[in-house]
Each structure stands twice: as structure tokens, then as C-alpha cells.
Amino acid sequence: MATLDKFLSIKENDEKTKKKESKKKSSKSNKTSESLVSHDHFELTPEFENQLWKVADKLRKKMEVHQYKYVVLGLIFLRALTCRFYERRKEIEEELSNPNSELYTEDPELRKMILEDEDFYLSEGVLYLPKETRWDYFVENVMSPNIGEIIDTAIEILEEKYPDRLKDVIPKIYAQSPLDNHDYSYLINKFSEISFGKEHRVKDVFGRIYEYFLGKFTEVEGKLGGKFYTPRSLTKLIVDVLDVKGGSIFDPACGSGGFFVSALEKLEREGIDINELSIYGQDSDPMAYRLTKMNLIIRGAEGDIRIDDSYHDDKFMDMTFDYVVANPPFNDSEWDANRIKPDDPRLRIGNKKVPVPPNGNANYMWILHFIYHTAPNGKAGFVMANGALSAGNVEGEIRKAIIENDLVYGIVACPPKLFYNVSLPVSLWFIRKEKPDYMKGKVLFINAKNLYKQISRRQNILTEEHIKKIVDKFRMFESGEDEDKINELGFAKVATIDEIAKNGYVLTPGRYVGVKIEDDGIPFEVKMKEYSEELKKLLDEEEKLRNKVKEILDALGF
């Protein structure tokens, strides 16, 4: 961090200039800034989130969803930058006023100099914002007919000041959008209510809001929006099973960066500095790059995120990672398999060369990609369409090679409807390059199909209890616990590679965990009598309905 010595030197050489600048400060701007520092009474509730969404959703009358999504998320991001700036500013002010702090000074001019020095912000991962880029400047000019241009200009200033972090991150679409100053006023005034306080850190508040809006846009857009968004319960489950700590994490289909967020949150829960985790991501969609970068910056993190096709232009070809995570496109077809060269290093499992996956389905190209990028002592966890568990032909040959090389250490069959508007059943795969001796030749299968909470007609989620139940089984397996304690009929089973081979190298958990039959203590004869009586009632009811329909048709002359 910068020190007072630097500023004492600056003060001696430039005191007159600083005095002139201080006179230019208006009481109005100071008051505006002060009002944005914090609101200790602020509380982020589901009701408040819903209010924000209703405000944003009114734009749907003027713009398509895929357009106004970026208008809204961009404004939330700009609001977050300002709040984080003022949050850090308040921290500096407290240090300057604290006699026990190294920054303590009673010199008002020196205090002003320090408050405007960007080193004191950047050292804590906070961007120093020029006045024209702060939210309060937007508020002051909110009724200006060129407010859209003011916002775009602010974005350009930030890009020029921080090209490595912000170049092409925030869409400059505000001047060209069909929204007028009244629309922007409506949004800006409502988003101004989002604040922070001692109990509500900026990155927590805005991280939650950003995630909430991503989820809501996914609901509205359906499958189109879903390609950017992996349900939070799934990203958390995978990150927890992998037990992500420090090191490197890579997502080659990063979408909006959900896996990175879950990893960062896990580190913070465990008291680990988030800077201990190096983040790498790739996606073929430029908008995914923007969403991920904004998602990370809001949370005070940075990442090496690149744009291109992971199949054919792997931007991290020479790198392996401690953790590989992903939710790739399911059953992607026409992916130009013919462009994969025979000597592609991804087409090798151990000492065995495997064929190129079929052009009609890229699932196994993704799996090979994940394995290739997993470090020798690393782990991978990813979402995959259920078809990959049992696919035959070339895919079956690749799966056999993966299993025989003892790379799979866990498979979880997921409950239905975890993805909004996507009914395709999915499973989670977990890969390890090097297993401990007690795990070698074994795979943990978990059937979690009935482990869910329904939150709407279209969507289910995994609760914290569900996630813990699954993670606990993996912890037992990885710690060498007795298999009799791990195995649970109908839910979990540690199977050997020999067992899997006897099942044709199929990885469907249901093949191994068995079926749990509940005994309610009622004798079979009693049950059959009840069922027979119920069936007779239903058949009688059917006959009555048939006669009723016939009467109606006769009356109508049919």
C-alpha cells in the first residue's frame, strides 16, 4: 500500500495546486458523495429484489429481452463500481482519522490528496473512479436528454483508464438504445436505492443482485438465456465436491462465471484469501466474456477470460489446472469434428489414442477437453447430458478408455428440472488424474434423482441439506471410510471397475445403487384387496362417463 511519505513529498512540491483544487469542490458534490457512502439501515430482501426486477422488466415494452438485459446488467455493474469506490473511500477516511493507523494525519490538505490517490484504491482491488464515471454524476444528469451518451462516455473513460480489466466489458449501448431520459431516470432512481452498510458489503449485495437478475433473465429468455447461466445449486455442489481451495480453476465454457463465483464464496466462507485462486475461462460468445468479467469485478476478483471456440481454438492449450469445472452445451451437433487433427493431444487417454467424437454430438469432445486440462494432481467436475453415461460406438470406446485408466471417481444422477425451461436429464462427472491407493479402481455412484425441492412448476433446486448429503458421501469416499458406511441402498454405492466392465462400461448410477423398497408393514393380501376395490371403482366410474358422453353425442345428433 502507498505510504504517507509519498504524500508529504507531493504536498511540499505541489501545495499551491492542491489548494486551488480544493476550492473548486462544491458543497453539492460533497453532499451527493456522502449520501452514497453507506446506508446502515439498508436491507436486501426478496421483496426488494422483486421490486428491482419489476422496474427493469418494464423495459420489455421497448426492447427485446436480449437487448435490455445488457442495459440493466450494465447499470447494475456501474452502480456497484461506485458503491465499492465509496465503500473504500470511507475505509480510507476512517484510517486517516484513527490515531492508531499508519495513515493518521490531521492535515486536511494531505487527507484530500490521499483520498484522491488511486493507489489507495487499487491496492485493495477497487477501481478509482473519475467524477464523470460515478453514479452520483448520472443522478445529477439523469433528466438530461443525452443521458445515454453520458453513460457511454463514462464507460469509454473507464475502458481507457483500465483497459486490462474493462476493455469491451460494459456494452456501450445506452446512446443508441430506444430508451429516453425518462426511462433511464426510472432505472437510475430505483437502482440508487441499492446500497450497503456495515452489515452489507458491496460485493455481497451486488453479487446477489447480479446473480438474481441473471436467473430472472434466464426465466424470460428460456433456453437462449440458459446457455449463460448454470443453476447456483449445481455450481455450489460441484465446487464443494471438488473442495476448491487455492490454486488454479478453469472453465472452458464459462457462460456468466457462475462456477467462479461459487468457488470465491467457498474460499471466503473458509477464511481463505480469494487472491489465492487464479481464475481462467473461455467462451465462444463475446457476451459471456462480458458477463463473466462483470461478475468477477463485482466480487473484487480478476480472471484471465478469453473469447473463442474451445473445440478448435483452445486459448489455454499449453496449460493444466488444479480444478476444471464446466457446464458445456449439451449434445452439441455439427461442431466441425473434421477440424480436429489426428495428433490433437486431447485425443489421448493415458497411453491410449482415442478416436475423434462424432460430429453429431460433442459431449465426448468436451469430456476429453476437461481431462486434458486437468493437472496431474488436479480434479474436474462438470455437468453432462445423461446420454453420455451409456452412449455406444465411438463414444462408448472413449468412455471405456476413460474408465480403464481409472480417471472417474464419481458420478451423480441429478434430479429433474434443475435447469429452467430445460427438461433434459443431467448428471455430474468427477475426474481425478491421481487417486489415493484406497480409491484406485473404484467409482462412487450417487442417485440423487429424488433429492430436490420444487420451487415452481418448471424448476427444482438442490437445498443446502441435499448438497451436504451428497458432499458427505464424497468426503467419506475420499477419506478412505469403510464402504459399508458409504453404501446406501437406492442412493450411494462404491463400485469397482470390474463391476462397471460387467455392465458394459455404462456409468448410469441406477445400475449400481439398487432400488430401495419401502416396507409399510401392510400384508400383501390386504394391499391386493384394496387395489382391486380401487380398480373396480375406477372402472365403474369410467363406464358412467362413457354413457354420459354417449348421451351428449346422441342429443347433438352424432
From Swiss-Prot:
InterPro entries: D12N6_MeTrfase_N, DNA_methylase_A-5, DNA_methylase_N6_adenine_CS, SAM-dependent_MTases_sf, T1MK-like_N_sf, Type-I_RE_MTase_Subunit. S-adenosyl-L-methionine binds at K227, F228, Y229, T230, P231, R232, S256, G257, G258, D283. The keyword DNA-binding applies. It is an enzyme of class 2 (transferase). Residues 8-18 have a biased composition (Basic and acidic residues). The keyword DNA-binding applies. Keywords: DNA-binding, Methyltransferase, Plasmid, Restriction system, S-adenosyl-L-methionine, Transferase. GO terms for molecular function: DNA binding; N-methyltransferase activity; site-specific DNA-methyltransferase (adenine-specific) activity. Its EC number is 2.1.1.72. It catalyses: a 2'-deoxyadenosine in DNA + S-adenosyl-L-methionine = an N(6)-methyl-2'-deoxyadenosine in DNA + S-adenosyl-L-homocysteine + H(+). Belongs to the N(4)/N(6)-methyltransferase family. The type I restriction/modification system is composed of three polypeptides R, M and S. Type I restriction and modification enzymes are complex, multifunctional systems which require ATP, S-adenosyl methionine and Mg(2+) as cofactors and, in addition to their endonucleolytic and methylase activities, are potent DNA-dependent ATPases. This is Type I restriction enzyme MjaIX methylase subunit.
